[in-house]
């Protein structure tokens, strides 16, 4: 049905008010805005002709009644009680809901009692503020309501989002002994900040919660039959004085200060259906409730200094209402309707390499049984020992692909550098020994080549190397003599990853003797290693060429002890070093390719004495 002019009562206020309201007054704007409110089809009922002809004095602000010639005169109920809340009463078991849409039929006798009650209240009131836009409250301790009013309930019966749109609703100014019989009041309060109504007991609201029947005083069993006339409430009241009772403040919704009391009731929901010729506006509201026990945790967090970013520590706010946590991060709609807001961010602990490297090296040394008495070198899996790098493996940074590509592109150069050549050595016995032609030779520490100065190796060549024999042949004979078995020729060079072959030389042992019959005074350990990384004469780390087809090995002797029974007292065993020329590759400069470079490795162990 079509709605009549809702602002009719507001334009014809009677003389008892003594106020002339302009057409553009906020009261009229509120009345025009409330014309677009929705009325539930289940709650809305047509008026009957008998009810339409009822006393106009009773149907004061009836928008469905025919227009009257003059405005209705409001009763000057200046002595009405100031109530703390403006909500609807709970529904009695034998009556229908008492809301703005279901008003109660009041008999003539009840109207007379109401008028008498107003006259008694006028004697107890001291002053009356401006009430042109305020709501009418008429109540009886034993009967229902005589005018179109909302019902007041106690603050404990409010929902989480219920509340009037008035910042300072009416407060009770009477003593407690007078509040008990007047607990059930029918009060109507509407906010001036919005064009919608909040509700309790089934009233309409944009953010609506279901009715809940909670009241300190039980409802009166005598309830008159409901009226089918639907009358909207009067205009909102102006600002009233705020009473310092925290439990008397209603919950707030849009742009109104939060109250000081939070109810302990679960929210309900009421479905709002639009009527004919009306509009619907739905606003999403994020409400975060503080549960019991969380306030103590927040206080502990304040002492420890644990706060979210952007959240201020306000201890002066002792508000009982839950504070809305600031939104952190994007809003995700679950199932397209429910907003999910991430409110917590958990700190993460990132372990840096400074913690992982020592643990990794310790585990590696224990697993491989390595002697890690040295400095760890950054970038390569090596440690520095005996003034040189000791690398058990090549590691991931070894440029094996670049080395093999260079070898494939420069095979002739590699043969000349690495080479196939004939070695013809003459011993002291003279006489042109056997020649071994076209044998690929590997460069080692004691192998003579064209770079050895004249006389550096020929002086003792006849004592250690026979004509036409290689260094590994002599080394193989020494190992066979020490181990008492036979091995294949060249087996000591190998091609394994570590490439280490150890042999101990002890004083008095046969393998420590020379052609002169003298023995080594210091114990030493012979190692044949195939290095992957080494430090050159300039202190730069270079990759040593050791691939499947091109292998380079180093023969070295490492001192086992600092003193021996034959080297003690003022004497001691010292480690000696020697320079080696090896094929190397610069991992930082691919343009250099493979080149020859000098590297220092341990050579032997000698016993030295003080002068």
Swiss-Prot record:
Disulfide bonds: 522-573, 559-605, 567-607
Residue spans of biased composition, Gly residues class: 487-498
GO BP: central nervous system formation; innate immune response
Keywords (A to Z) from UniProt: Disulfide bond, Glycoprotein, Signal
Glycosylated sites: 5, 335, 351, 511
Its job: Neurotrophin which may function as a ligand to the Toll-related receptor Tollo. Involved in a Tollo and JNK signaling pathway that positively regulates neuromuscular junction (NMJ) growth in presynaptic motorneurons. May function by activating Tollo to promote the phosphorylation of JNK.
Subunit structure, as described in the record: Homodimer; disulfide-linked.
Record-given protein name: Protein spaetzle 3
Native source species: Drosophila melanogaster
Gene: spz3
């Amino acid at each position: 049905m079509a709605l009549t002019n809702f602002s009719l009562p507001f334009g014809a206020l009677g003389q008892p008010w003594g106020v002339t309201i302009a057409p553009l007054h906020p009261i009229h704007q509120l009345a025009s805005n409330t014309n677009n409110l929705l009325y539930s089809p289940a709650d809305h009922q047509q008026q009957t002709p008998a009810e339409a002809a009822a006393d106009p004095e009773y149907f004061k602000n009836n928008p469905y009644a025919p227009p009257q010639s003059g405005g209705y005169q409001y009763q000057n109920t200046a002595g009405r009680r100031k109530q703390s809340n403006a909500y609807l009463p709970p529904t009695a078991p034998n009556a229908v809901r008492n809301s703005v849409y279901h008003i109660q039929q009041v008999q003539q006798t009840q109207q007379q009692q109401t008028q008498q009650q107003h006259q008694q209240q006028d004697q107890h009131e001291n002053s009356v503020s401006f009430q042109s836009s305020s709501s009418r409250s008429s109540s009886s301790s034993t009967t229902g309501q005589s005018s179109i009013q909302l019902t007041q309930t106690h603050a404990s019966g409010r929902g989480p989002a219920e509340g009037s749109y008035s910042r300072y609703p009416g407060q009770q100014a009477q003593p407690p002994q007078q509040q008990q019989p007047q607990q059930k009041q029918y009060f109507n309060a509407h906010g001036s900040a919005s064009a919608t109504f909040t509700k309790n007991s089934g009233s309409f609201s944009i953010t609506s919660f279901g009715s809940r029947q909670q009241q300190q005083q039980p409802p009166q069993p005598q309830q008159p039959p409901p009226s089918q006339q639907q009358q909207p409430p009067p205009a909102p009241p102006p600002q009233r004085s705020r009473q310092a009772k925290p439990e008397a403040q209603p919950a707030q919704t849009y742009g109104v200060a939060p109250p000081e009391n939070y109810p302990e009731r679960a929210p309900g929901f009421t479905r709002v259906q639009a009527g004919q010729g009306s509009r619907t506006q739905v606003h999403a509201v994020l409400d975060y409730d503080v549960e019991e026990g969380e306030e103590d945790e927040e206080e502990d967090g304040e002492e420890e200094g644990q706060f979210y970013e952007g959240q201020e520590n306000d201890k002066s706010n002792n508000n009982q209402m839950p504070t809305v946590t600031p939104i952190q991060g994007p809003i995700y709609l679950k199932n397209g309707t429910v907003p999910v807001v991430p409110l917590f961010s958990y700190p993460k602990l990132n372990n840096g390499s400074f913690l992982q490297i020592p643990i990794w090296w310790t585990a590696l040394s224990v697993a491989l049984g390595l002697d890690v008495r040295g400095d760890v070198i950054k970038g390569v899996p090596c440690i520095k020992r005996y003034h040189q790098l000791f690398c058990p493996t090549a590691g991931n940074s070894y440029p094996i692909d670049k080395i093999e590509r260079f070898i494939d592109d420069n095979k002739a150069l590699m043969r000349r550098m690495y080479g196939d050549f004939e070695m013809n050595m003459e011993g002291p016995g003279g006489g042109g020994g056997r020649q071994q032609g076209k044998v690929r030779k590997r460069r080692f520490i004691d192998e003579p080549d064209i770079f050895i100065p004249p006389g550096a190796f020929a002086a003792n060549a006849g004592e250690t190397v026979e004509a036409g024999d290689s260094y590994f042949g002599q080394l193989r004979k020494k190992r066979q003599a020490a181990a008492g078995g036979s091995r294949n020729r060249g087996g000591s060079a190998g091609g394994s990853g570590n490439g280490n072959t150890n042999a101990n030389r002890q004083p008095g042992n046969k393998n420590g003797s020379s052609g002169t019959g003298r023995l080594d005074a210091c114990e030493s350990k012979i190692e044949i290693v195939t290095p992957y990384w080494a430090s050159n004469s300039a202190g730069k780390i270079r990759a040593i060429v050791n691939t499947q087809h091109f292998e380079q090995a180093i023969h070295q002797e490492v001192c086992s002890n600092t003193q021996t029974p034959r080297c003690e007292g003022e004497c001691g065993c010292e480690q000696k070093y020697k320079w080696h020329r090896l094929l190397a590759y610069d991992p930082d400069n691919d343009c250099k390719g493979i080149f020859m470079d000098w590297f220092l490795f341990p050579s032997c162990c000698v016993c030295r004495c003080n002068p």
